Amino acid sequence: MNAVYLDNNATTRVDPAAVSAMLPFFTEQFGNASSMHAFGAEVGGALHTARRQLQALLGAEFDHEIVYTAGGTESDNTAILSALETQAGRNEIVTSAVEHPAVLALCAWLEKTRGTRVHYIGVDARGRLDIDAYRRALSPRTAIASIMWANNETGTIFPVETLAAVAHEAGALFHTDAVQAVGKIPMNLRHSEIDMLSLSGHKLHAPKGIGALYVRRGVRLRPLIRGGHQERGRRAGTENVPGIIGLGVAAELARHHIDEENTRVRALRDRLEQGLLERIGNAWVTGDTENRLPNTANVAFEFIEGEAILLLMNKAGIAASSGSACTSGSLEPSHVLRAMHVPYTAAHGAIRFSFSRENTDADVDRVLDVMPGIIAKLREMSPFWDGAAAAKSGFAPTYA
């Protein structure tokens, strides 16, 4: 039995082409790019090529608008903390209630330790941002608005260009966590109002431990990590050369295949959703089904726990993720689904299936074969499930 991996929003397999490109930089071209000798110059040239590859994927105007980091979390932290330092007289942040913890945890820390005021903008039942509330929250005191490009759990896409323009009307900077969007949504940042953008290599078939922060030319950036002069003095530390090379190759592959792969992956995702809803009652798709990432399906199965579903899926050789998280011994639904007002009976049983270019029709077939039995087995054990009553109820979620 072949394993089925449908957790690509968590991480992706490194593309073999990226691995091949990286290998020489471990044992042959191992110089420090800051060194004056030939070993350093050789590495420096390779880094320049990789930077241009990422620039092309982002549609950035200048390659020096890219600052390499260790990943999305560092990029998010750098952008927000820098804005608070460079935007004189401004000490407020506007963000959404459904951001990644890389943003939300930082905001909570800033509230507690620095007295920063943070406005958390809500979403509707489909995960769409309340634009009017966003506009009202912005003021001359706002240093930065940070809104993700696409949600990691539901795939819902946010209108970041509109949000950036509105932020600028208030004199604030605009940052977007685009970790889930880069490589899945075509970008043209040279014609964008986005000031800063975070990305992470391991979400697009590059290695873990490498990411980047796009900083639009003219936007001041205070480094989070201080030391040497690397990245034009904006991020100290010897460059992760193999990681940067791998990210460059992955970016090049994504740019060349984004349209065809989006079409193919969307078809797989849609077939999975349709098949699950046809085979399993009291289940539905969460998020904005008309405006979301092509690879992401978040399906809520009512009256059972996501953790239990995942355990049985894992035994069947299928990897996905749950909308629930176990924290300090108490099971709580995802903060994203709570913000969307998904009923607890469904939010606890939400499963995210996230595809990549490596997935096939056979993967979908396997999930459709296995999932009905898993859900039926768990519902039989659930004290909240009355199959006969549910079948007669004609249940449909009123919040969708």
UniProtKB/Swiss-Prot annotation:
GO terms for biological process: amino acid metabolic process; nitrogen fixation. Its EC number is 2.8.1.7. The keyword Metal-binding applies. The modification N6-(pyridoxal phosphate)lysine is found at residue 203. GO terms for molecular function: cysteine desulfurase activity; iron-sulfur cluster binding; metal ion binding; pyridoxal phosphate binding. Pyridoxal 5'-phosphate binds at residues 72-73, 152, 180, 200-202, 238. Keywords: Iron, Iron-sulfur, Metal-binding, Nitrogen fixation, Pyridoxal phosphate, Transferase. [2Fe-2S] cluster binds at residue 326. It catalyses: (sulfur carrier)-H + L-cysteine = (sulfur carrier)-SH + L-alanine. PROSITE patterns: AA_TRANSFER_CLASS_5. The active site is at residue 326. InterPro entries: Aminotrans_V_dom, Aminotrans_V_PyrdxlP_BS, Cys_deSase_NifS_bac/arc, Cysteine_dSase, PyrdxlP-dep_Trfase, PyrdxlP-dep_Trfase_major, PyrdxlP-dep_Trfase_small. Belongs to the class-V pyridoxal-phosphate-dependent aminotransferase family. NifS/IscS subfamily. PANTHER family: CYSTEINE DESULFURASE (PTHR11601:SF34), CYSTEINE DESULFURYLASE FAMILY MEMBER (PTHR11601). Homodimer. This is Cysteine desulfurase. It comes from Gluconacetobacter diazotrophicus (strain ATCC 49037 / DSM 5601 / CCUG 37298 / CIP 103539 / LMG 7603 / PAl5). The lineage of its organism: Bacteria, Pseudomonadati, Pseudomonadota, Alphaproteobacteria, Acetobacterales.
